[in-house]
């Protein structure tokens, strides 16, 4: 889960097997048990961590194993078996053990760093300056640092022509 730093009512959540989706919620529009998310990003991959960029409207996700819904045999289909009853198989996809950056609010994937680690990226954190992501893979016994976002452009205040003069 991750709260959005520049739009305080946005909460991103990620799910694992068998759902494998990122959901973005607005706490100002949640009403009761049957609330729907503002956006859903289907990945068919375990979403292990999420981070909003403090500098731009982007959401970073780290992933683990990917999976595919396998339809039941033909004999089962005649009995109206739903997708929920279908088997799930672990597969290798570009999102397996990856880092992905998604644009908000379009939810378009801007970047995928495939195979960021050789196994599941189990945890990550954002650096204090909001530019780097640190990822952990216990199976590799490795911590990696990734520069994801650049330093924000400083708009800087121009000095007023009257700044050097005081009334008192």
Which residues fall in each region the model found?
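A beta-strand-loop signature enriched in Asp, Gly, Thr, and Trp
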Residues: 1-4, 8-56, 61-63
């Amino acid at each position: 889960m991750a709260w959005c730093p520049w739009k305080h009512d946005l909460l991103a959540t990620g799910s694992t097997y068998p759902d494998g989706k990122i959901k973005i919620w607005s706490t100002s529009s949640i009403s009761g048990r049957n609330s729907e998310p503002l956006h859903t990003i289907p990945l068919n991959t375990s979403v292990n961590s999420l981070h909003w960029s403090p500098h731009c409207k982007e959401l970073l996700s780290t992933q683990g194993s990917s999976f595919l819904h396998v339809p039941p045999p033909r004999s089962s289909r005649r009995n109206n078996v739903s997708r929920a009853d279908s088997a799930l198989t672990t597969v290798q996809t570009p999102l397996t053990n990856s880092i992905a950056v998604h644009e908000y609010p379009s939810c378009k994937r801007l970047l995928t760093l495939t195979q960021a680690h050789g196994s599941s990226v189990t945890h990550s954190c954002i650096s204090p300056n909001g530019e780097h992501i640190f990822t952990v893979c216990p199976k590799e016994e490795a911590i990696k640092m990734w520069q994801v976002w650049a330093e924000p452009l400083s708009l800087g205040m121009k000095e007023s022509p009257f700044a050097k003069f005081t009334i008192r």
